[in-house]
Amino acid sequence: MSDRITLTLRAPLDRALDADAIAADRLAALSAQEIAALPLWDGRNAVALGDVFSVSGERAQTVVLEGDLAKLRGVGSMMSGGTLEIRGSIGSAVGARMLGGAIAVQGSAGDDAGSAMSGGSLVIAGNAGDRAGGALQGASKGMTGGHIVVRGSVGREAGARMRRGTLCCASAGAGAGLGMIAGNVIVAGAIGDEPGAGNKRGSIVALGGVRVPQTYAYACTYRPPHLSLMLLFLRRRFAFPVDDAHLHGLYKRYSGDLAEIGKGEILEWQAT
Amino acid sequence: MEIRGVQIDDTFAEAFGMRGARIIITAKNEKWARESANKLTGFATSVIACKCEAAVERELAPSETPDGRPGISVLLFTMDSDSLPKRVIERIGQTVLTCPTTACFDGLPDSPDRLAIGKPLRTFGDGFQASKMIDGQRYWRVPVMEGEFLIQETFGKAKGVGGGNFLILAESAEVALDAAEAAVESMAGMPGVILPFPGGIVRSGSKVGAKKYKGMIASTNDAFAPTLRVITRTALPEGVNSVLEIVLDGLDFRSIATAMRAGIDAACIAGVRSITAGNYGGKLGPYHFHLRRIMSGDLDDAPKAASAGPAAQP
């Protein structure tokens, strides 16, 4: 038994590989030989993990990935426990449908990061692509639980159709919170156009200003009591950059999407 | 045993099992947290007529509260599990929900026994309420005229101890009050303990039932009433002209014993003749706080054994 399993990329990848076999909980009970025999998928062709990565350590709750992993898809998919540490950037669908545990990406992530996740935490030190925390193609719900923290920017449609959980980021592209059912999208900086279109009960928190869509209507300016609790938690747990002024400050509340049931909201922080 | 010339009687306080909750009230500032807590704990001195016993446990700094605002911790006790959520719900509903700027949180997060408190109170929102999951806990945002009231969905329940007590027997009413005030001050803010009576002090200690009036649940403790010294079976030593009692409820035996030790020590001032305690002969309450053991530093629950000595009844 080791304290960690380290997978080091043997050579740069020249094509994308599906790597949903790599998840901390799935590797935790395996020997190094068993890990090396796991399949990665190049289209319909299986490739042994050991041919792509050198494996050191076995039977550990923590898995470390090293190398240029931007062409690796689906790492951490359906992970339910343990810790996955990605030392570099990672490809699309990292942490998709994850149920628990923690994934930390030291670089950036591709599209669909944490899509349809229901628990655990996905922390990305760099940027994330489109549809972070969103729904799988054709699915009615995006993430239904857990936390996605992106210290950089997220692409388009972050948190699309999310049902529960929290996604927070430094800035977000257009269409953040598209079709949200509930849950929270918290943006420290700029938000792209049309946030919260089709939002039912979700909360979009704009700490750095927002252009409010026409299908939202101003309700009031107040101090939302749950926000201090939520922002304190994010600051404490994920070192999300929240000032004391955000914790107890005034927010404009816009109700929407009024083309939907109108129980959603955009909370825009007011600098004093 | 004597402390600074004050005799500590060889007797014990007899206490009972209760069920308790810890309610954290936060607000814009300490004033409004205190205002709400004072209302919540009003008329909650004794389960005999108030249905619960409650008091402020201590003030909380912003760094100690869930939302980073000033807060007050309140303990509330009832005699049984069924009535605890009823009392908590009706009091929060009338005194915290109504109070400007407050929010309300569970103070026993590690308790596996959960009471649905915010869940029924959310219906005040008439369908406009919304919930948020934060750090694994559900909170309800209830829209109100001021803005929003936030309350945690469930609160922890604890098995507590009610009726810890000691009596201060003094040469005068002035000395008795000075000693009792000193005792209360020394116990203020101790974790896990409340003093539910006015200012933490009881002047009307009672006995079970009554000698004259049938149907009375409690009546004056005539054995400790100085004006009745010559016409009843008194328990008052010579020179004692006034008695005050301190009653304590707590989340566990040790918390009460620790507070009693501090309070009794502080009460031993000039003019106090002795410190004693109320019990029923050891037959009713499962928790016995032996004064001399406590003052010797033994603060843990001991095997039950009735002690000799005068039996006052709290």
Task: State each model region's role.
Chain B
Residues 2-10, 14, 19-57, 61, ...:
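Conserved mixed alpha/beta catalytic, RNA-binding, or beta-rich assembly cores of soluble enzyme
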